[in-house]
A protein has these predicted regions:
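Membrane-embedded hairpin module used as a gating/binding unit in multi-pass transport
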Residues: 146-229
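Structural motif
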Residues: 2, 101-103, 220-225, 256, ...
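Histidine-anchored nucleotide/phosphate-binding helix
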Residues: 9-29, 239-248
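Active-site segments that bind and position negatively charged phosphate/pyrophosphate groups
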Residues: 197, 201-263, 289-292
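Short glycine-rich or small-residue beta-strand-to-loop segments that form or flank ligand, phosphate
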Residues: 1-10, 35-41, 223-225
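An acidic, phosphate/nucleotide-engaging active-site surface
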Residues: 45-115
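C-terminal non-catalytic interaction/assembly regions of soluble proteins
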Residues: 25, 238-369
Length: 369
C-alpha cells in the first residue's frame, strides 16, 4: 500500500485504509504479506505518532510500515526513462511488490493540474533526482521563459509535469486506487476506487464540480482571503490563494489579500528563496536545484511583479514583506481599499470591477464563456 505522508493527512486516509486491509485479508492475504510504504516524496521521515495519524491505530499496529527516503540510493531501483527524458528511480519496496495499491485524496494542484493518483509514485516514492527532473518541466524551455503555461492548475492533457508523472506511474502499474474527495469543510464528500487512472480521473471531475465558480470576466480588483486559520499560518500556505486571485484578476490589476501569517518565518526554505536579486536569478536557482518552496516563491514573485498586491497581515510582518516579496503590507482591509482606490483614480479608472473571494484556496474561478 503506497499511502500519502503526513503533509496530506487531511485526506482522512486513517478512516479508510483499514477497510482496504480488511478486504485484502478476506481475499486471502495475511497481514505479513501486506506492508505500507509512505509516499514522502522529498519530505522528511515520519515520527511513530505521524504514522498512526496517517493510517489509524489499528492499521499501524498490524501492518509493517516503511518510510521512503528519496536520497537513499541503496533503496532505489531504476525502472526506465520517460519520453521527456526523466530517469525513473523508484523505491525498491514498491518495485518488488507483487501488487501496488494507491491510497490518498484528490485535490487541485498548481503544477500537476490535480493531486493524487500518479503523484503517489512520482514524486511520492521516487528518487530525489527523478523528482528534480520531473518538476523542472514546470518551467519554460530556457532561462527567462519563466513558468510553463501548460503545467497549470486543472490541466492534465498536455501538461508535461502530469504526463511525465503518469508515464512513471505506468512503469510500476499499480493494480488499484482508493482515494477520498474532501469538501471545503474537510469532510469526505465521496470516494473513488478502481483502475488507478480511470478512478483518479473521475475523482478530478468531482473536485472540479465541487470547486468551480463561474465569473463573468476578470476584474480590475480582486479581494481574496486565504481562508483563515490554519490556511494562513504562514506565507507559504497562505499564498495558495494567489493562483485563484490571478485567474480572477486582469494582468496589471490589483489584488488585496488577507494572510495573518503568525509564523511568517516558516518554513525558512520559502522565505530564504527571496534572497535572489531579481526574477532571472531566482529562475536560474530553481533550474539548478528545484524545490517546492523555491517554486512557490518564484510563482509569488511573478504575481507581485505582474499585479499590485496589498497584503493585510500582522504589523510585525511588514519589514519582511517589504524587503523580500515585492508586496505592500497593510494593517486592515480598509487601508488596502483606500490605497487601491487611489491607484485606480491615478490610472483613470472610474468604472472599475471587483471580485470578492472569501475562500481563495477552496475554489477555482473560470470565465463564463
Amino acid at each position: 500500500l503506497v499511502v500519502a505522508d503526513i503533509t496530506r493527512a487531511w485526506n482522512r486516509a486513517s478512516e479508510f485504509t483499514g477497510h482496504v486491509d480488511n478486504q485484502l485479508n478476506d481475499a486471502g492475504n495475511p497481514h505479513d504479506d501486506i506492508y505500507i510504504d509512505f509516499a514522502q516524496g522529498t519530505h522528511r521521515v515520519h515520527t511513530d505518532e505521524e504514522n498512526v495519524t496517517c493510517v489509524g491505530e489499528e492499521v499501524a499496529s498490524r501492518i509493517k510500515m516503511y518510510q521512503h527516503v528519496s536520497t537513499d540510493k541503496s533503496m532505489l531501483t531504476h525502472v526506465g526513462t520517460t519520453t521527456r527524458g526523466t530517469d525513473v528511480w523508484i523505491d525498491t519496496r514498491v518495485v518488488e511488490a507483487d501488487k501496488v495499491i494507491l491510497i490518498n485524496a484528490i485535490s487541485t494542484h498548481d503544477m500537476a493540474g490535480f493531486g493524487g493518483g500518479r503523484k503517489l509514485i512520482l514524486p511520492g516514492v521516487a528518487g530525489f533526482e527523478t523528482v528534480q527532473q520531473n518538476h523542472c518541466h514546470a518551467l519554460g524551455p530556457t532561462v527567462g521563459s519563466g513558468l510553463n503555461p501548460d503545467a497549470a492548475l486543472l490541466k492534465i492533457a498536455g501538461n508535461p509535469v502530469s504526463e511525465d508523472m503518469q508515464e512513471a506511474c505506468d512503469m510500476i502499474a499499480p493494480c488499484f486506487l482508493v482515494h477520498s474527495v474532501i469538501n471545503a469543510e474537510g469532510e469526505i464528500s465521496s470516494m473513488v476506487g478502481g483502475d488507478p487512472y480511470k478512478a483518479w480521473l473521475e475523482g478530478t471531475r468531482e473536485i472540479y464540480r465541487m470547486q468551480k465558480v463561474r465569473m463573468k470576466a476578470q476584474t480590475d480588483v480582486t479581494i481574496v482571503s486565504a481562508g483563515g486559520y490554519p490556511k494562513d499560518t504562514n506565507l507559504y500556505q497562505g499564498t495558495k490563494c494567489y493562483t485563484t486571485a490571478e485567474i480572477a484578476t486582469k494582468k496589471g490589476g490589483i489584488i488585496i489579500t488577507m494572510i495573518e501569517a503568525e509564523d511568517v518565518q516558516e518554513p525558512p526554505a520559502y522565505l530564504g528563496s527571496f534572497k535572489y536579486k531579481n526574477l532571472t536569478e531566482m529562475e536560474e536557482g530553481l533550474r539548478a536545484c528545484f524545490t517546492i518552496p523555491l517554486f512557490v516563491a518564484f510563482e509569488n514573485l511573478i504575481t507581485a511583479m505582474t499585479h499590485t498586491v496589498y497584503i493585510v497581515t500582522r504589523p510585525e510582518n511588514f519589514d519582511i514583506l517589504r524587503e523580500r516579496t515585492h508586496q505592500i503590507p497593510v494593517a486592515t482591509v480598509e487601508e488596502a481599499w483606500e490605497l487601491a482606490k487611489k491607484q485606480l483614480a491615478e490610472e483613470g479608472k472610474e468604472d472599475y470591477t471587483i471580485n470578492v473571494i472569501p475562500q481563495g484556496s477552496a475554489i477555482v474561478p473560470y470565465v463564463e464563456e
